Amino acid sequence: MNIYYEQDADLAVLQNKNIAILGYGSQGHAHALNLKDSGMNVCVGLKTDSASCAKAREAGLKVDTVAEAVKWADIVMILLPDQTQKSVYDNEIAPNLKSGATLAFGHGFNIHYKQIVPPADVNVIMIAPKSPGHLVRRTYTEGNGVPCLIAVHQDATGDAKAIALAWAKGIGGTKAGVIETSFKDETETDLFGEQAVLCGGSAELIKAGFETLTEAGYPAELAYFECMHELKLIVDLYYEGGLSRMNYSVSDTAEYGGMTRGPRVVTSAAKAEMKKILEEIQDGRFAKEFIDECNSGYKKMNELRESNRNHPIEVVGAKLRGMMSWLKKK
């Protein structure tokens, strides 16, 4: 796997190019401001009624409609929600995209699953920082950066990779390291991590643990602390130094109990189900299901959201978080 640093990227590749960033959310604001501060000519493309227009202008950025920004741009970065990208592309990007332009993405979903099929005469690249946008921005202002992924799906002009590397450098990524991958690998591993571990697996583990304790008669408050609240303490240790750091930092009782009982929770049956989830991602079944869900008005998703909001752990959690001064907004 190739990893690139400062000396491997040249910001001059982006100079004298017009850069449009579509979207001004978590990632959009970070990319726009970092590239602007790196000396690039940046315009943010937004709907005319977007609340983000004022924010972007206040930050000193040029703002225009999506269509006009794309007409003007040599490089167009799409940092919009996955489910809205196809419609915006079909209606506002494709009719205005220059031949020889570069189309960039922060995630590979729409390219990999062929929701967006760009013409052969444009570059298609990805630059994906592996952190939230606020951290991309903060580390840049501190003179550092966060690790990034880059990928080239289509190289029409012969310099698509150089553009991706220059972009990564412009947002600070080459100071940490830039890993080369593919749209396929980024998309499939990202979706799997979200579904099986980060957003799906962990949430179900928390709820199951909470329910096991409360059904056995223990107070909901204690169940919340042990199964939800303290998870951050453990995840922070993983984040800082991996599994070994966590095992070193907890008590011997916790370490032994975790190593001997954990495999009884995440069993071979759970891993077999993970493999099925991965297969659904690889063969496109999940993508089709999600796209159909979006097109049908989010009926199932809204029902699941409501179910989660009404779970007892949310009720007791809201009460206990009210006791935590460090969580209260100043």
Curated annotation (Swiss-Prot):
The reply on keyword Ribonucleoprotein is: no
Question: Which metal ions or organic cofactors does this protein require, according to UniProt?
Answer: Mg(2+)
Binding of substrate, residues: 251
According to UniProt, this protein's pathway is: Amino-acid biosynthesis; L-isoleucine biosynthesis; L-isoleucine from 2-oxobutanoate: step 2/4; Amino-acid biosynthesis; L-valine biosynthesis; L-valine from pyruvate: step 2/4
This protein's superkingdom? Bacteria
Span of domain KARI C-terminal knotted: 182-327
Decide whether keyword Cytoplasm is in the record: no
Q: Per UniProt, where does Mg(2+) 1 bind?
A: 190, 194
What the entry lists under InterPro entries is as follows: 6-PGluconate_DH-like_C_sf (IPR008927), KARI (IPR013023), KARI_C (IPR000506), KARI_N (IPR013116), KARI_prok (IPR014359), NAD(P)-bd_dom_sf (IPR036291)
Recorded catalytic reaction(s): these are: (2R)-2,3-dihydroxy-3-methylbutanoate + NADP(+) = (2S)-2-acetolactate + NADPH + H(+); (2R,3R)-2,3-dihydroxy-3-methylpentanoate + NADP(+) = (S)-2-ethyl-2-hydroxy-3-oxobutanoate + NADPH + H(+)
Q: Where does NADP(+) bind?
A: 24-27, 47, 50, 52, 82-85, 133
| Role description | Involved in the biosynthesis of branched-chain amino acids (BCAA). Catalyzes an alkyl-migration followed by a ketol-acid reduction of (S)-2-acetolactate (S2AL) to yield (R)-2,3-dihydroxy-isovalerate. In the isomerase reaction, S2AL is rearranged via a Mg-dependent methyl migration to produce 3-hydroxy-3-methyl-2-ketobutyrate (HMKB). In the reductase reaction, this 2-ketoacid undergoes a metal-dependent reduction by NADPH to yield (R)-2,3-dihydroxy-isovalerate.
Question: Which NCBIfam families has this protein been placed in?
Answer: ilvC, PRK05479.1, PRK13403.1
Tell me its family. Belongs to the ketol-acid reductoisomerase family.
Q: Which HAMAP family match?
A: IlvC (MF_00435)
Q: What is this protein called?
A: Ketol-acid reductoisomerase (NADP(+))
Identify the coding gene.
ilvC
